[in-house]
């Protein structure tokens, strides 16, 4: 049997493969790490894996939510342990392979220098990775797991245990009448809202940037400063101000602006269609300054030679706009425009702060202006439908990621980068 095979076989117990290769210090390190792992995390792994499979067996002793969280932590810790275990196996195999080829093994000093040179990036990024795992990955895994349980108001620890129900929650979204109708109504409005609001802010921002960028326009700095001022005001403050302006009872929109033109007051807050229109207009106001600023930078980077050549060829102003300006702007800004659509698809703040997703809709668990993310919030915080909210979150994430990836792949900027 070759050295590499013997070393790999012995490495089933961490460190023994290194001992076989006469790498004593490295063997002690791996043996210590293996023993310490089970000594420190043994109880966590035992309780965690029991909890994640059973979700508890006795009330009120077992809290299913805590057991699920502990089980997910146990899975994460196990992944780290398996990674170190793989390094142990690979190291023993590679050293055994060197012995089979009659090559000298690296000295302790050489191994130390190799670890310092090759492992430095991992050491530096280690704390960030740790924070990422427990601030991002852990909540994602926890939400993902909840979607496959029956966790709701009637199955809520510590009074009740929760159970694994597989894909039943996902099936309920499409088979239970109230959930199905609400889901498709909210999804339809979410798509309309995303397309309308994003298109408005992008179109307005690019249009104003083109106007202000004209060579014969005076006081450009003044106009640019005025147009980016809405971006300087915190978004939540602007939304609350607009909520007051559109208020049916005392808002300036009805009592001052519309009254000045002799128009009767409109139900901005109590009619779903008017509320939706107000939200789209508000997002156009909130979002156009950023697009205006980026578009201005793109326009200033377009070479004047292109316009001069077009003028010599007899191109009109609109021809220059169509064949030079807009293509250059859209190619450069395609990723930014896509992120604007993605952001608005999940734009919770404006929906919640304006009127809480209202007005209420008869026979629906969502309000007239609720988008998917605000509906998920209501299901969690008001209805205690935790598993349903988690399932909707998964569907929402898959939908947004799929659309965003498809859009990125269709853009010329993505193809040129590839």
Curated annotation (Swiss-Prot):
Involved in galactan degradation. Part of the ABC transporter complex GanPQS involved in the uptake of galactooligosaccharides. Responsible for the translocation of the substrate across the membrane. InterPro entries: MetI-like, MetI-like_sf. Keywords: Cell membrane, Membrane, Sugar transport, Transmembrane, Transmembrane helix, Transport. Belongs to the binding-protein-dependent transport system permease family. Its main location: membrane. This is Galactooligosaccharides transport system permease protein GanP. It is found in: Cell membrane. GO terms for biological process: maltodextrin transmembrane transport. Induction: Repressed by the transcriptional regulator GanR and induced by galactobiose. Also repressed by glucose. The chain crosses the membrane at residues 25-45, 65-85, 129-149, 191-211, 226-246, 279-299, 323-343, 357-379, 388-408. GO terms for molecular function: ABC-type maltose transporter activity. It is a multi-pass membrane protein. The complex is composed of two ATP-binding proteins (MsmX), two transmembrane proteins (GanP and GanQ) and a solute-binding protein (GanS).
